[in-house]
Amino acid sequence: MYCRRSHLKKPSMSHRTHDYWIAHQGTPLHGVLSIPGDKSISHRAVMFAALADGTSRIDGFLEAEDTCSTAEILARLGVRIETPLSTQRIVHGVGVDGLQASHIPLDCGNAGTGMRLLAGLLVAQPFDSVLVGDASLSKRPMRRVTDPLSQMGARIDTSDDGTPPLRIYGGQLLHGIDFISPVASAQIKSAVLLAGLYARNETVVREPHPTRDYTERMLTAFGVDIDVSTGCARLRGGQRLCATDITIPADFSSAAFYLVAASVIPGSDITLRAVGLNPRRIGLLTVLRLMGANIVESNRHEQGGEPVVDLRVRYAPLQGTRVPEDLVADMIDEFPALFVAAAAAEGQTVVSGAAELRVKESDRLAAMVTGLRVLGVQVDETADGATIHGGPIGHGTINSHGDHRIAMAFSIAGQLSVSTVRIEDVANVATSFPDYETLARSAGFGLEVYCDPA
């Protein structure tokens, strides 16, 4: 049964798993495409605006399930948020000390970013809170966040295996720490910095590799004095946030699927407008260029404190490459798309140092390796990466494991298939890219959406 889903409605988990796509060869991609707003920035913008003194306007807000979950949680905590347009939020901030207790668990849905950042915020409040998530989020590791928060004096419980739900006990006095993060994670860094706003003395976060600095840039935009150097951020507690207006650029991770698709579908020529090019986010762009992609930047400017460009992408034959390990953290969300580019390239592409892929919304490493093998692509899997041997892409049925990025990646593979690719469990695409199917088809994708009532 063909269906058209509304991204504004959250179907029950028992029903979501029956949504599937049939992807097949379409036409060369053409057009000027507007990608939805950045998910990471949208989470932070609505959260920091809620903590600010005064009213903030957010334009370009991503109207997707993950970001709406965060906004709904803030509303439950007493923040008034207006929605004049689907991509706009007017947030009436309550100040750093104005949040109110919720008497029911706070549902983050599939939003790992939302849960981890909210944990950093809620450990500093005078009331107890419980953060829960969907089946996928409930399997993701949280001790990497709860451990440093506990070092600051927070009381926070997880399940026995370190996964959600998170039970947070309010009324704790936090103190700043000098935290050396064992992994490069902007979410860990952001959670600790948020708690640091409420802590005595100074909070320092040091990373093994610099990660995306959305939190640091946005705290600065909201008037917080934060010192940033390579791989290190520090701030003093007790600061207040001042309301400001934010314009959010297009999400690079969402644009990534079109960067890859236009690069591998012969005859394609598209332009992606106003894409955020945070320096710690664009590893995929570097790797695609190493592979021979034809991607040209224009109209560079700043938007919401972030560098923004238009990207023109034209088809070019790709060659396999070795992905530099120092780029892995800068493209951790883009690896599913890269794996498809590698499958379409001539020669071998080698990925290493990417063990973090195993603890995303799914084990993305295993999911991509298994899926590509189903389509006849030779892939050698390792503990922290894979070697992908480029070649023809066949047909088959792919289990996306409810992971939005796995589903979208294999929709690209379907454009190169000798037949069709069926991609199952795709409803969670709405968590990051509402109306992905509509935009993809308008650009030239062969992509049909079905609901299996069984």
UniProtKB/Swiss-Prot annotation:
Known catalytic reactions: 3-phosphoshikimate + phosphoenolpyruvate = 5-O-(1-carboxyvinyl)-3-phosphoshikimate + phosphate
MF term (GO), any: 3-phosphoshikimate 1-carboxyvinyltransferase activity
Database matches in Pfam families: EPSP_synthase (PF00275)
InterPro entries given in the database record: Enolpyruvate_Tfrase_dom (IPR001986), Enolpyruvate_Tfrase_sf (IPR036968), EPSP_synthase (IPR006264), EPSP_synthase_CS (IPR023193), RNA3'P_cycl/enolpyr_Trfase_a/b (IPR013792)
Keyword entries, A-Z: Amino-acid biosynthesis, Aromatic amino acid biosynthesis, Cytoplasm, Transferase
Signal peptide: none
Residue positions binding phosphoenolpyruvate: K39, G112, R140, Q187, R364, R405
The EC number(s) this enzyme carries: 2.5.1.19
Positions bound to 3-phosphoshikimate: K39, S40, R44, S185, Q187, D333, K360
Annotated Gene3D superfamilies: Enolpyruvate transferase domain (3.65.10.10)
A Gene Ontology BP annotation from the UniProt entry: chorismate biosynthetic process
Annotated coiled-coil segments of the chain: none
Active site: residue positions: D333
Entry GO terms, CC: cytoplasm
Pathway this chain belongs to: Metabolic intermediate biosynthesis; chorismate biosynthesis; chorismate from D-erythrose 4-phosphate and phosphoenolpyruvate: step 6/7
Compartmental location: Cytoplasm
PANTHER family, sorted: AROM/DEHYDROQUINATE SYNTHASE, PENTAFUNCTIONAL AROM POLYPEPTIDE
Subunit structure: Monomer.
UniProt function note: Catalyzes the transfer of the enolpyruvyl moiety of phosphoenolpyruvate (PEP) to the 5-hydroxyl of shikimate-3-phosphate (S3P) to produce enolpyruvyl shikimate-3-phosphate and inorganic phosphate.
Family: Belongs to the EPSP synthase family.
Name the UniProt record assigns to this protein: 3-phosphoshikimate 1-carboxyvinyltransferase
Naturally occurring in which organism (per UniProt): Xylella fastidiosa (strain 9a5c)
Gene: aroA
